[in-house]
Amino acid sequence: MTKKIIFSTGGTGGHIFPAINLMKHFFDKGYKVLLVTDIRGNNFVKNYSEFKSYVLKAETPTNKNLFKKFLSFLVIFNSIIKSIIILKKEKPDLIFGFGGYVSFPISFVSKFFNLPLIIYENNMVLGRANRYLSLFSKKILVAKNISINFPEKYKGKTYEVGSILDKKIINYSISKKNNNKENFSILILGGSQGAEIFGTIVPPVIKMINNEGYKIEIIQQCIMSQKISIVNFYKKNNIKNYVFEFDKNILELILSSNLAITRCGASTTAELVHTLTPFIAVPLPNSVDNHQYLNAKYYQNNGCCWILGQNNFNTENLFNLIMETIKNKNKLENIRENMKKNYNKNVYKDIENEIKEFI
């Protein structure tokens, strides 16, 4: 009889993309896979006809006044009822949670159906939903060994498996990376929401570098309202550019880059490390539990990146840091060597081994 796994996840890129990657893996292995997410996450899987999905609502009850907390709990309660209906209908063999508040209801309800729950944490600190779910999960799988605010009592069921990236990234050949192009290519990644500050600070810095006589090619993600002005700026200054809001062929963009300037979502930084792309990390200052800074700090401690805090993210500091990387090719090569020590190409096999006793 074919085994069935329900994957539950929040709808942000850092949650939904690892979930989709693992769903594709188990689907190819012959499992039935279903997704429970919010409307944002559901938009990402519309093109996957093989995946059945359910949309739930969920809100965080934290940092709200009493009335809004009450409304949030009503939303969560309604999603718990819907989760009971889903589990009775689908009769899965395993629940696999990726965090985000929408993952909480069905993961919580799984306890009362005696279903094994596995949770996965992509960041260097346990997210709030995963923190609650850790209590009754069978195993906690983590991308990296978490030591920050991690409950000691859960360490016995915690296993490091690595980042669940697209297999094209995990399996790509390092020889495809072209670090000797005529133009020095810089990739700007603002995360799933874009980053307005990148659109303000980066273009004048690229102009300054271009004026120094260096041939620069810029590949820049931006928010929609900035796109026309950024494109016109680069065109006016004769700077080769590709400016985009979203591009599904992100691997090709990464592979064509010598350096990245990026927010610090766990998946994005892991993709850069797997493709040996040195990066300047600019953590989102208001990320939940400061997880973006902690993600970046892990890689900085392992010699894989530079950190430039948003308070210090100005044209002078960014110009000096980029110029340092352009002039010192040995430093870039040292970072690439460090990156080779900081990824796991066997993540899918390791996950299979960790869950096989439950399915």
Set out the residue ranges of the language-model regions.
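A short, well-ordered alpha-helix in the C-terminal region of glycosyltransferases
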Residues: K331-K345
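Donor-nucleotide binding loops and adjacent catalytic segments primarily
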Residues: K24, V36, G41-S49, S173-A260, ...
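An amphipathic, basic-hydrophobic alpha-helix
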Residues: N65-L94, F112
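Conserved nucleotide-sugar phosphate-binding/catalytic loop shared by glycosyltransferases and other
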Residues: K4-G10, F27-V75, V161, G190, ...
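Active-site-proximal region of nucleotide-activated glycan assembly enzymes
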Residues: K4, K32, R40, F51, ...
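C-terminal "capping" alpha-helix adjacent to the active site of nucleotide-linked donor transferases
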Residues: N302, W306-G309, F313-N330
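Acidic donor-binding loop of glycosyltransferase active sites
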Residues: P92-L94, I239, L255-A270, T277-P278
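C-terminal alpha-helical cap of glycosyltransferases
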Residues: N344-I359
